[in-house]
């Protein structure tokens, strides 16, 4: 079962890159053998990003030219397992990835709980146009399934933030919070939908009956719902060099601390604790001076690479 995102194609703007986010839960026993041909087709077409392969399917985000992305997607859909693959598109003003990585994993999204299978049991999908009504219902408890560094820059109004460091911590958070049963409806959301596939399956397994999740995730909501009708506050963290997007999937104003990979606001950049590529308000006090000197050396290499018109792989 996959979260059926509607593909929305936009006219290509010169100088922009097409970004395609995708996932598909399917029994895929030959996933290890598929790694090399998938890597090769991406490399041959100048496509970069990360794709994860596992027994349970595929997950990832890639970017490239319109033609390059179309070729890779056609290759994927030519496989019997991915004939029904649906992807989500957005744009980037610069290539948002440094390289192309196809990785073999135990799970395409890591929860670490055995026997959770979204192909068999999953929550009820809610279209973006119906989401506001659901989360405004006093009988609904809204839960953000993302990590703390993501929720720090944007959330839905009234959502409960588990403040997890990784998705692996989510099941334990649920088990430790008996009060979650106090409301009859549970509404869950994440960036693009994949974490909610497993999170809602887990909630159903834990005995929650009315479990809903936002179809297409925050990204689909930001694409379809105009700002004046939106219950979203802030920006949505994305796992590439854009760092964040806002309504209409426009690139946000956040940057990334290359020391700790946390998103930074313009206010964070003005902090005396911020040193580009070395430290920020989130990590300054957790790093030793030896760490910071190592980061400074890396930052100098990044600056030199930029002057040569190249991109340093450590950036």
Curated annotation (Swiss-Prot):
PROSITE patterns in the cross-refs: RHODANESE_3
- Origin organism is Sinorhizobium medicae (strain WSM419)
Q: What does the record give as EC number?
A: 1.14.-.-
Q: Does the keyword tRNA processing apply?
A: yes
SMART domains named among the record's database cross-references: RHOD
Q: Which family does it belong to?
A: Belongs to the TrhO family.
The signal peptide stretch is none
Active site (record annotation): 190 (cysteine persulfide intermediate)
Reaction(s) catalysed by this chain's protein: uridine(34) in tRNA + AH2 + O2 = 5-hydroxyuridine(34) in tRNA + A + H2O
Protein name (record): tRNA uridine(34) hydroxylase
Q: Domain named Rhodanese: which ranges?
A: 136-230
Alphabetical keyword list? Oxidoreductase, tRNA processing
The organism's place on the tree of life at top rank: Bacteria
């Amino acid at each position: 079962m996959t979260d059926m995102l509607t593909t929305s194609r936009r006219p290509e703007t010169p100088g922009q890159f097409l970004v395609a986010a995708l996932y598909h839960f399917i029994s895929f026993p030959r996933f290890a053998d598929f790694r090399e041909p998938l890597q090769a087709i991406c490399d041959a077409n100048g496509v970069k990003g990360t794709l994860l392969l596992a027994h349970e399917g595929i997950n990832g985000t890639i970017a490239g030219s319109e033609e390059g992305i179309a070729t890779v997607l056609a290759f994927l859909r030519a496989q019997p397992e991915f004939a029904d693959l649906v992807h989500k598109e957005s744009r980037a003003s610069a290539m948002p990835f440094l390289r192309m990585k196809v990785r073999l994993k135990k799970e395409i999204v890591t929860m670490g709980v055995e026997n959770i299978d979204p192909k068999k049991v999953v929550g009820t999908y809610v279209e973006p146009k119906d989401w506001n009504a659901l989360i405004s219902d006093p009988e609904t408890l809204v839960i953000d399934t993302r990590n703390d560094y993501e929720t720090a820059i944007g959330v839905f109004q009234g959502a409960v933030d588990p403040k997890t460091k990784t998705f692996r911590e989510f099941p334990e958070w649920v088990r430790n919070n008996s009060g979650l049963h106090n409301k009859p409806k549970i509404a869950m959301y994440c960036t693009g939908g994949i974490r909610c596939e497993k999170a809602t399956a887990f909630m159903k397994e834990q005995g929650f009956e009315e479990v809903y999740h936002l179809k297409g995730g925050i990204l689909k909501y930001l694409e379809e719902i105009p700002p004046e009708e939106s219950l979203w506050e802030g920006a949505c963290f994305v796992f590439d060099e854009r760092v964040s997007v806002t309504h209409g999937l426009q690139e946000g104003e956040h940057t990334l601390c290359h020391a700790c990979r946390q998103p930074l606001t313009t206010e964070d950049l003005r902090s005396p604790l911020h040193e580009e590529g070395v430290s920020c308000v989130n990590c300054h006090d957790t790093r030793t001076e030896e760490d910071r000197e190592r980061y400074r050396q890396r930052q100098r290499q990044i600056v030199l690479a930029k002057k040569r018109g190249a991109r340093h792989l450590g950036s």
